[in-house]
């Protein structure tokens, strides 16, 4: 691909993005969560700079957003927005443009560089519900030795774009969304700032989500947070597996290019926001399928009744507990309840609702063999609502399924067992904004 001039692939680094540990296991490895020198927007410009993650837009949507708000970080995160559509999204000049724009914005005062190593508190409020995390840098080695746990496979072709972006800009710009089991010591420090200190940013985005940021620079608080995280033995990637894998690969590439590295260099760490598990909100991730796989509705209902209790419903069905599903087709909603034996003897993955639906209905009845690649299935994030399921089933698709959300405990269980979540299992809201925090490497 040309971005690994010293033979990165020769190091066998693709093996770090899998289930195998690449560092010998050690006893009682503790998380290293470090404060960092942050590059961030000038206070009065933060609301204009902050942008949704690069991967929620297609090229045209990204271009329209940058035209609407020229300061949007998308112009750097998706630098192809600065070019005609004839220019390849992944052309070398696109990444070079991202680097130039970041440097230009720093020179012009759009971004400032803090002088001290700090942590930051990042609070997002959606529908009146706050979610408060800590912005910090996590360790490449913690990722490799599984202190930071994964629950998704990554595809190398999807990593290449972010590897090139980070390496060219020498900056990590999209934070990785991490989760940990709530800790009272960390909670108390964070709560004291939220309750008593003035935020450095406080704005509401056009989508109605409020964003507030506080800076933690007092040495005693910085030291206390650092020590508290050393008592936390497991941290989990909630969202951003490809960004995390890309940041790690750039770090390993830089290590190869700097054989005398000490481990203290910034490329050994990656930008993260860490949230306590009890503040996270996972929404349903719903399914819609193109046809009934050659069956009539009567045949289909009869066949699925072997494994599910099927009941007609009066209106929309939003499942209220694990093991239940909504189903909509031909203008009618149904309530499905998986029979108890479907969960017997299953591991953390097999007992997930998304697995039960796939293993006992989507696969054997509707013929969806691999949901990652099958063109007959589509996935609809819960943020779009149940009406979107009706709309799709009444137009380009045939049948839709509403899911009960995967719980954060289920996600932790899968990661702890070093298993992989099925595709499209979790939909996190609200989305972290890019451009508010930049970590230069």
Language-model features: locations:
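Surface-exposed, charge/polar-rich loops and edge strands
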Residues: 27-441
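Short hydrophobic alpha-helical segments enriched in small aliphatic residues
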Residues: 7-10
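Short, positively charged and aromatic/hydrophobic N-terminal segments
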Residues: 3, 16-22, 26-29
């Amino acid at each position: 691909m040309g971005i690994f001039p010293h033979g990165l692939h020769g190091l066998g680094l693709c093996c770090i993005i899998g289930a195998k540990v690449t560092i010998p296991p050690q006893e009682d490895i503790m998380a290293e969560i470090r404060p960092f020198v942050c590059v961030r927007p000038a206070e009065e410009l933060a609301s204009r700079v902050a942008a949704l993650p690069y991967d929620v837009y297609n090229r045209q949507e990204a271009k329209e957003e940058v035209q609407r708000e020229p300061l949007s970080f998308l112009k750097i995160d998706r630098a192809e927005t600065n070019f005609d559509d004839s220019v390849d999204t992944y052309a070398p000049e696109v990444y070079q443009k991202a680097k130039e724009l970041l440097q230009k914005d720093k020179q012009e005062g759009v971004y400032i560089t803090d002088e001290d190593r700090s942590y930051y508190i990042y609070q997002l409020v959606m529908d009146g519900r706050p979610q408060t995390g800590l912005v910090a840098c996590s360790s490449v080695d913690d990722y490799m030795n599984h202190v930071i746990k994964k629950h998704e496979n990554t595809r190398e072709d999807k990593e290449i774009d972010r590897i090139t972006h980070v390496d060219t800009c020498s900056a990590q710009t999209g934070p990785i969304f991490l989760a940990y089991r709530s800790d009272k010591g960390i909670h108390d420090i964070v709560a004291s700032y939220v309750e008593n200190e003035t935020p450095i940013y406080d704005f509401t985005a056009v989508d109605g989500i409020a964003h507030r940021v506080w800076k933690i620079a007092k040495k005693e608080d910085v030291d206390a947070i650092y020590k508290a995280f050393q008592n936390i033995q497991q941290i989990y990637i909630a969202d951003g597996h490809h960004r995390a894998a890309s940041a790690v690969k750039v770090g390993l590439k830089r290590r190869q290019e700097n054989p005398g590295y000490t481990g203290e260099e910034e490329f050994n760490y990656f930008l993260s926001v860490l949230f306590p598990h009890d503040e996270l909100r996972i929404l349903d991730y719903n399914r819609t399928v193109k046809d009934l796989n050659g069956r009539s509705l009567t045949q289909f209902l009869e066949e699925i009744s072997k494994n599910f209790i099927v009941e007609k419903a009066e209106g929309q069905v939003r499942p209220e507990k694990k093991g239940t599903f909504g189903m909509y087709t031909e203008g009618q909603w149904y309530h499905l309840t998986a029979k108890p034996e479907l969960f017997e003897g299953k591991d953390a993955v097999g007992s997930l609702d998304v697995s039960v639906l796939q293993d006992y209905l989507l696969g054997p009845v509707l013929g969806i063999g691999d949901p990652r690649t099958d063109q007959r299935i589509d996935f609809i994030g819960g943020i779009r609502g149940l009406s979107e399921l009706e709309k799709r089933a009444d137009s380009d698709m045939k049948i839709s399924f509403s899911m009960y959300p995967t719980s954060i405990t289920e996600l932790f269980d899968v990661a702890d067992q070093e298993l992989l979540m099925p595709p499209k299992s979790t939909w996190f809201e609200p989305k972290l904004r890019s451009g508010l925090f930049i970590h230069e490497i």
